[in-house]
């Protein structure tokens, strides 16, 4: 076996920590008080999917004794965290805690004028939002409640009631509806109302990210991002390129909750991936079946996500991050009460040593060494990216990535460079195995098919998104063709003006060679166009056979790949290694129908509609030792633009335990595809083979209208549309 082979992690004392590789970040950010982000004693418990995460949140908030600090991307007051048909929504629960005298702070991302709500319903029905009922499954009663909740917490709901009663019979009805919400009416008049403070937070511009630079290969790019292949644009809204989206639409994407920070013996924290919006509530069954919003899943889109609850010294870091954001001068506090700032000073007497890990506070939690890492705007911190780029060079067996996006090409480039080094140093094992679960739907993949294609190209897997791959290659050839035609005109003019026959002959030779290059490129473009038309015709025929509406192409249909497509990256002329060091399964997840069967499509308005679980997770596990759970997606936005926060651990119990739990869901408890000891290369190799069998079996089942055996489905996206905003 190779000298690079990693051994299984061991423990030191009671804390789970490895003794060979160091998976933590040594050069993490340094804080104002001289300390820095570092691995510290903690407890950790993963919370898989919304039911588990939100019920835990509800119970902890309900039992809070001192304070509740929430930092979140999306907040909907009418959302029910605990869906037993009797528990209050989060808006009422937080009001109740404020009435009890507990301090409640809510920090939610928003852009000036709430302009993000044109497309993102992240504020519920807050007064001033642009889309009133964006989330499918949200009831009109919830929409009304949201608006009244925001009026209540700023002390103006009683005025709304009075005005409604005097504005005619139609508005009298509204007044009566408001008065049914006794908690809102009580709260808006209570002197304890100021115990609940709500702020919106924006992200500071990072102008240094957009300074032009010259790369070592001589190319000029208009940014300083790690991904040097980002498509440059004109920086306009209509251009649709990354530079406008990343410059103008930065988001505060962190998701944390702190309970009772002022009492270290009681304090717990949450590092979340879930947002506090209805469509993030789902259970691990991922059924298409829906019900009332206080009794179960009410959003029609199944959603996969992972959060966590922690104790110990990591709470100090989570609090530091929260206070730093809460006390910013450019936050917008809701209402007219005096602005609540200075929480940093009020808590400065607490140090990490006050917060010892306490397993008794959280059942089934693990004692670990853990480190909080983040992406941040002021100061400019990019530690989550550093962790990924560092640790991918330490993996020796496998990587598991469950992420909303799979498009950070520098991660693959970093590993490919590392692979050459370890091969030269005598590694005898084959490529590592990258198991990936992500999204292929329009909603899930978002506006980033260009960088997703770049990721697939580096992995030699462009066949799973062939339309985009061909379209991008066509664009590249178009640029080449334009340059050749300009050169042709230059050569022609030089030739006819050449003073000697020798010079003229040389220029004519160059002209002829350039002419042949033009013909080659034009032929290649025509060939790409022909193959894309054939693919579209084949897809249309399949949809007709399946009684699908041809006017609504199935963007995620997993077609049987032709031999040509299986070698698409090479066919398109890209130079890739036959042994890049990584073998990748790139998968999406199928939901279940009302009968508990995995389905590729479902009926919506009488038509077959593609069925895909929306993967919102941001989890990566390496070699059954390293784990990161965070708010950060695998893209440039999360690594270098938005604010993000995550927790990293090097602990076999946590890594293997979480990996096995997630794979139990995705493989339908197939032990052969979800074995113990994946740190062992031979075991990972066999598991990779078994995943391949499951994927092929599900593909055959789809083709023959059979029943899939598990949720795993090979990523496939036929649509050729290229998006460059992320």
Question: What do the predicted segments below correspond to?
Answer:
Residues 2-726:
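Charged, low-complexity intrinsically disordered terminal segments
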């Amino acid at each position: 076996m190779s000298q690079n082979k990693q051994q299984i992690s061991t423990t030191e004392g009671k804390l789970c920590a490895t003794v060979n590789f160091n998976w933590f970040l040594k050069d993490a950010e340094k804080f104002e008080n001289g300390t820095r982000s570092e691995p510290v004693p903690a407890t950790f418990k993963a919370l898989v999917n919304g039911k588990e995460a939100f019920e835990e949140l509800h119970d902890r908030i309900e039992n809070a004794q001192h304070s509740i600090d929430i930092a979140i991307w999306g907040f909907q007051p009418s959302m029910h965290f605990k869906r037993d048909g009797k528990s209050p929504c989060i808006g009422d629960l937080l009001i109740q805690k404020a009435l009890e005298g507990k301090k409640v702070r809510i920090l939610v991302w928003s852009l000036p004028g709430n302009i993000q709500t044109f497309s993102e319903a992240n504020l519920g029905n807050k007064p001033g939002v642009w889309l009133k009922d964006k989330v499918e499954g949200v009831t009109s009663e919830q929409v009304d409640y949201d608006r009244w909740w925001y009026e209540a917490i700023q002390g103006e709901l009683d005025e709304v009631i009075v005005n409604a009663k005097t504005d005619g019979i139609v508005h009298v009805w509204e007044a009566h509806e408001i008065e049914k919400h006794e908690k809102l009416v009580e709260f808006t008049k209570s002197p304890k109302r100021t115990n609940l403070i709500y702020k919106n937070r924006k992200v500071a511009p990072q102008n240094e990210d957009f300074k032009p630079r010259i790369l070592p290969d001589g190319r000029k790019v208009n940014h300083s991002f790690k991904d040097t292949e980002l498509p440059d644009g004109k920086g306009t809204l209509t251009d649709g390129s990354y530079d406008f989206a990343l410059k103008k639409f930065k988001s505060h994407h962190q998701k944390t909750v702190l309970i009772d920070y002022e009492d270290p013996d009681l304090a717990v924290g949450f590092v979340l991936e879930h947002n506090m919006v209805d469509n993030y509530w789902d259970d691990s069954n991922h059924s298409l079946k829906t019900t009332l919003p206080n009794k179960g899943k009410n959003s029609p889109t199944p959603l996969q996500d992972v959060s966590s609850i922690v104790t110990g010294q990591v709470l100090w870091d989570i609090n530091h991050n929260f206070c730093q954001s809460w006390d910013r001068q450019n936050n917008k506090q809701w209402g007219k009460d005096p602005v609540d700032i200075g929480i940093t000073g009020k808590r400065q007497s607490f140090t990490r040593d006050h917060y010892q890990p306490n397993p008794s506070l959280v059942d089934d939690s693990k004692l670990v060494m853990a480190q909080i890492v983040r992406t941040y705007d002021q100061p400019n911190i990019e530690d989550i990216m550093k962790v990924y780029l560092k640790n991918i060079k330490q993996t020796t067996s496998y990587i598991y990535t469950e992420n909303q996006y799979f498009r950070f090409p520098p991660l693959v480039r970093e590993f490919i460079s590392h692979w050459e080094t370890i091969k030269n140093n005598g590694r005898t094992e084959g490529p590592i195995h990258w198991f990936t679960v992500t999204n292929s739907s329009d909603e899930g993949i978002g506006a980033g098919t260009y960088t997703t294609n770049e990721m697939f190209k580096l992995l030699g897997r462009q066949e799973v998104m062939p339309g985009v791959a061909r379209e991008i290659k066509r664009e590249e050839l178009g640029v080449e063709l334009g340059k050749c035609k300009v050169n042709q005109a230059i050569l022609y003019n030089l030739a006819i003006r050449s003073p000697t026959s020798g010079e003229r002959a040389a220029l004519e030779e160059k002209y002829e060679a350039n002419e042949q290059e033009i013909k080659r490129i034009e032929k290649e473009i025509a060939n790409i166009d022909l193959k894309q038309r054939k693919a579209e015709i084949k897809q249309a025929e399949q949809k007709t056979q399946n009684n699908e509406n041809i006017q609504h192409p199935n963007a995620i249909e997993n077609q049987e790949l032709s031999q040509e497509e299986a070698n698409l990256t090479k066919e398109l002329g890209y130079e890739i290694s036959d042994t890049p060091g990584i073998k990748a399964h790139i998968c999406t997840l199928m939901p279940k129908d009302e009968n508990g069967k995995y389905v590729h499509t479902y009926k919506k308005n009488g038509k077959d509609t593609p069925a895909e679980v929306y993967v919102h997770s941001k989890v990566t596990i390496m070699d059954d030792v390293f784990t990161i759970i965070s708010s950060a997606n695998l893209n440039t936005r999360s690594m270098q633009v938005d604010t993000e926060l995550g927790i990293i651990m090097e602990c076999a119990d946590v890594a293997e335990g979480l990996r096995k739990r997630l794979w139990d869901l995705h493989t339908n408890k197939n032990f052969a595809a979800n074995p113990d000891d994946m740190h062992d290369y031979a075991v990972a190799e066999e598991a990779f083979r078994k995943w391949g069998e499951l994927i092929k079996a599900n593909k055959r089942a789809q083709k023959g209208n059979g029943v899939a055996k598990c949720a795993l489905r090979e990523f496939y996206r036929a649509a050729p549309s290229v998006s460059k905003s992320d």
